[in-house]
Amino acid sequence: KEAVNNINKKKKELQNTLLKGMPVLIKDITDVKGVRTTYGSKIFSNHIPLDSDLVVKTVESRGGVVLGKTNIPEFAAGSHTYNDLFGTTKNPWNLSLSAGGSSGGSAAALATGMAWFATGTDLGGSLRNPASWCGVVGLRPTPGLIPQGPSKTSFSNLSVNGPMARNVTDLSIFLDALVDHNNRDPLSYKKDVGSYHKNLNCYSDKFFSIGYTEDFGIFPCDKEVRDMTKNTVKLLENLGHNVNVEYPNMEAAEESFQILRAYLFYSAYDFLLDEDEKLIKEEVLWNIKKGQKLNVNKLKKADKIRNTIYQETLDFFDKYDFLIAPSSIVPPFNLNEPWVKKVENNIFNNYVSWLMIAGCVSLTSCPSIAISTSFSENGAPIGIQIIAPPHQEEKLLSFVKTIEDALNISNMIPKDIN
């Protein structure tokens, strides 16, 4: 009711904005002034922010009206959306399965038609994984394209905010609304292209050179996901693109990512160590304490590895226009499991390792769009991430639109919402 009242009060004013009063859902890790924002934690169950995040301010300045908050795992840690405050977000296509995370609430809300636009955040696939599992579209942009914060970790570019929508066309509109230059974000920069929406078809008649991988040569991967990736590659070849098995070397990616992620968690959430540990999810505590134990030599090594990966990824893009990989190594899993423990013959001893096919891409600062390309045996969507060189969101969106058009599944909706 409050959102509708806001729209009615500002009808004339909103008509001159980009979003014209369209409702927008905000992930519950992001502050909205005067709106309960819990971060998925009992500790913040009654938290009312005094100010909004830059993402929200940008949305509202472009005519978006905040409709509500979407569910997350506690402190957005993990790729399965559940917490002790609001319970578990179910996959709209199969209610016994996970919607992914940590932007699972946003993805599920979009899939069920609650809104056209929702925000997500992505550290290690938190936006991409749920998008592909719920049959929607999500973009992890080049760091700095969308201003965010202020936060304790404003100078880190590992976690970014990004748009989520039901299809690529809507995604391009929402990206236009989110992009801005704001000095409050030290990584923010002025984009050098026009409207992503107006230019959405500017590469639609082009043929591209594409590298692809099912596993980067190192990650385990479920057979259903491997088959889906192969079938997507066949589709791209039928569309006239040149596709080869080639990809940057990610052998050391997990070592770097785990260290940098732990440092980020300790920097952002060290204060939680003074709280009652019974109120904090085990995985969150593990990540914070891992960061607490880091020394400068480990951080130095992590940065060196990341720099090497970045340079080798740019070398890859000297030869190829895009890189394609699965957005997740498994289809959506059982709702009652906290995280994936085993794939093929690999056993994971922490909640991060199974996400590394997305996490390794985060290290590159490259934009990546997740899109569903098929359905698993249990009836839930599965899909790929399409990765472009830094700052090439326009080209990336245009290319992914051609894939979406060829697949012709973006207008499908889960039967459960009826």
What would you call each of these model-derived segments?
Residues 19-39, 201-213, 260-314, 326-330, ...:
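Short helix-loop capping/hinge segments that flank enzyme active sites or metal/cofactor-binding pockets
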Residues 1-48, 76-78, 193-196, 200-201, ...:
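Short, well-ordered alpha-helical
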Residues 223-225, 254-264, 334-340:
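Short glycine/threonine-rich loop-to-helix capping motif typified by GTGT followed
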Residues 6-9, 189-196, 303-311, 350-351:
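Short gly/ser/thr-rich secondary-structure transition/capping motifs
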Residues 57, 61, 111-219, 230-239, ...:
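Structural helix-boundary/capping segments
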Residues 19-161, 215, 327-346:
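Short glycine/serine-rich loop/turn segments
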Residues 67, 242-247:
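General small-molecule cofactor/ligand-binding pocket signal
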Residues 351-364:
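Hydrophobic alpha-helical segments in the ANL/AMP-binding
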